[in-house]
Amino acid sequence: MSLSQAKYLPQEIIRRKRDGEVLTNDEINFFIQGVANNTVSEGQIAAFAMAIFFREMTMPERIALTCAMRDSGMVIDWSHMNFDGPIVDKHSTGGVGDVTSLMLGPMVAACGGYVPMISGRGLGHTGGTLDKLEAIPGYNITPTNDVFGKVTKQAGVAIIGQTGDLAPADKRVYATRDITATVDNISLITASILSKKLAAGLESLVMDVKVGSGAFMPTYEASEELAKSIVAVANGAGTNTTAILTDMNQVLASSAGNAVEVREAVRFLTGEYRNPRLLEVTMASCAEMLVLGKLAKDTAQAREKLQAVLDNGQAADRFGKMVAGLGGPSDFVENYDKYLAKAEIIRPVYAQQSGVISAMDTRAIGMAVVGMGGGRRVATDRIDYAVGFDQFIRLGEIADSNKPLAMIHARNEEQWQQAANALQSAIKVGGDYLPTPDVYRQIRAQDV
């Protein structure tokens, strides 16, 4: 390397960021290429992440970092598929009982959109869409690119796992952040989320950023800051993006787990049962997707179209096609109960006193699912798809001897008792209940 290239030494780039200087696009590209091809060491990634953690990045730097990480591997090009509608997707920062993807993809597909969704596994207390789908026997989350494209074209939606060739630089950066206390930084979170999503070749994206006791970000202000960063950076990187801020101060669906949430998703799609909060949050995300994809002129028209495909069975039909196309049973929607794992003990847990439900520690409820084996403590853990909770009480409702906190799905008495103790301490009975909206606000490109 000649002296004239010395400014592109990784340690010089780290030094400039450490000293609060603004990095150029070329410097960021050089560093991230080095991450992808292993010429930048883990120690250098750690130092770079810590420098960003303390010095932050400007919006142009965030856009450059996101694009560099997106372009570090394969970027899917759908043009050869000749889709006759927009390619749209949604990403959630994760929560408990957040099963929206399973209904949202088929609903948008039934309205004319194409949703090639690359999803993740559970992280900490949050459930993972992939783990839920793997509760369906035969469902393949790692199909070939050909099958991914074919199912997306035929069903309008395919939900699969991240392959190693999409945003490989993010994989290395994230693994290092995870062990160096640099996870919770807006610039790094923005680039990590968007590099993976934008590598999927999307035309538009809706970002669902959670707020509250089960949210990834600790405060409303932090959630709003992340949402604004994602909208600004994604639009700056060339993908039309809107964010919505939604409530995670209680479990979103009526259930939390894997098979229990898939069961709820199918019942939602067929109209057997629709939890009102889950319906509102799903509708809000879907409506933004239809507007961004120019499939509706405004959210009011979008909601009408979405309600129609729920009512006429087209959304449920798309879900069935996706499941069958990715290796699951062809009659899954009709006979889901035959295929989903069931726990040996399904019994209610009651509050220790009567009173109004005033608060939920949603994070603790998510960790209770993990404790039962419904999530992972380490990446190699196997998941028990049968365990979890359903029929959750809602904030503002009254718990008494007739109204339990939830039904526990457990493998044995000891597990049931541990889960019961966890729920009783995570759900507050008595005191003042302050209602929160299901959807706080939308953040669109013009808002940032």
Curated annotation (Swiss-Prot):
Q: What UniProt keywords apply to this chain's record, in alphabetical order? A: Glycosyltransferase, Transferase
Enzyme Commission number(s): 2.4.2.4
UniProt cross-references to InterPro entries, sorted A to Z:
Glycosyl_Trfase_fam3 (IPR000312), Glycosyl_Trfase_fam3_N_dom (IPR017459), Glycosyl_Trfase_fam3_N_dom_sf (IPR036320), Nuc_phospho_transferase (IPR035902), PYNP-like_C_sf (IPR036566), PYNP_C (IPR013102), Pyrmidine_PPas_bac/euk (IPR018090), Pyrmidine_PPase_CS (IPR017872)
User: Which SMART domains does this chain map to?
Assistant: PYNP_C
- Gene Ontology terms: cellular component: cytosol
Q: Which GO terms describe its molecular function?
A: 1,4-alpha-oligoglucan phosphorylase activity; thymidine phosphorylase activity
Checking HAMAP family in the record gives:
Thymid_phosp
Question: What does the record note on quaternary structure?
Answer: Homodimer.
Name of the protein in question: Thymidine phosphorylase
Lineage, highest ranks first? Bacteria, Pseudomonadati, Pseudomonadota, Gammaproteobacteria, Vibrionales
- Please name the gene that encodes this protein: deoA
